[in-house]
Curated annotation (Swiss-Prot):
Species the sequence originates in: Bacillus cytotoxicus (strain DSM 22905 / CIP 110041 / 391-98 / NVH 391-98)
InterPro entries, per database record: Holin-like_CidA, LrgA/CidA
Keyword annotations: Cell membrane, Cytolysis, Membrane, Transmembrane, Transmembrane helix
Source taxonomy: Bacteria, Bacillati, Bacillota, Bacilli, Bacillales
Any one Gene Ontology cellular component term annotated for this protein: plasma membrane
Keyword field contains Phosphoprotein: no
Name the record gives this protein: Holin-like protein CidA
Highest taxon in the source lineage: Bacteria
Similarity comment text for this entry: Belongs to the CidA/LrgA family. CidA subfamily.
Intracellular or extracellular location(s): Cell membrane
């Protein structure tokens, strides 16, 4: 029975992703459909249209298996050896700078939100 529940929850999450993709194609938005789907899920959770319990196990499962979703893209990088050898150092530098920026912005925003709630003194 657990697999049926898990499958249903994952299907519900994919429905949000597919709906986001459909909206992005219909409205010709420059935003990826998956982001629109996440936003739709956020709104649905915020207004209790979808209960957290309805997706919790499915989301936890997908997060646990997240590394499997990166394997195809990691393997695809091998196809571009020439590009990597030509721009490898530049790409590493860009990745390091962007990771640093994301980490800093996330940390600053988290601190601001916690101070706003009064959690941090």
């Amino acid at each position: 029975m657990k697999w049926w529940k898990l499958s249903g929850q994952i299907l519900l999450l994919f429905c949000f992703a597919w709906t986001g993709e459909w909206i992005a194609k219909q409205v010709h938005l420059p935003i990826p459909g998956s982001i629109i789907g996440i936003f739709l899920l956020l709104i649905s959770l915020k207004f209790n249209l979808v209960k957290k319990e309805w997706i919790q196990d499915g989301a936890d499962f997908l997060l646990k298996e997240l590394i499997l979703f990166f394997i195809p893209s990691a393997v695809a990088v091998i196809r571009y050896k020439d590009t990597l050898s030509q721009y490898g150092i530049d790409l590493i530098f860009i990745i390091m700078i962007s990771t640093l920026c994301v980490t800093l912005v996330t940390g600053i925003l988290t601190e601001l939100l916690l101070k706003r709630k009064g959690s941090v003194q």
